[in-house]
């Protein structure tokens, strides 16, 4: 994958938490060679207490969700104004810093808490590494997103285009 992203000419961003500043940093991976892309992706998924921070250029980085769990900023900064935000829980992001952007926000159903058709509650979503439960969540997210979008996506874009 890294060779597909490196030098592709299309922006492809990853968000990492800078441990020195406590702020999010956004890396346009299309501007980096494949080995640096691996470092960036490793850093962007370094969940504290699960994976170690990744050092890049003398700075330690962690999971970007620590400082920006809905990384709209890099896309907004390059001119995008229409976003589909798919949340992993019921907590929404503060999108007020993007006043001229349009958002279609998607939230998962409570079914996301059930595991393997056994009717039992799953462990905390991010830290549940059970492959079966991950597959269940992926399929549930795909199904619910397609169901929602089939009835709303056309309206979302039509309404905005008419303004």
What do these predicted regions represent?
Residues 1-163:
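Patatin-like phospholipase
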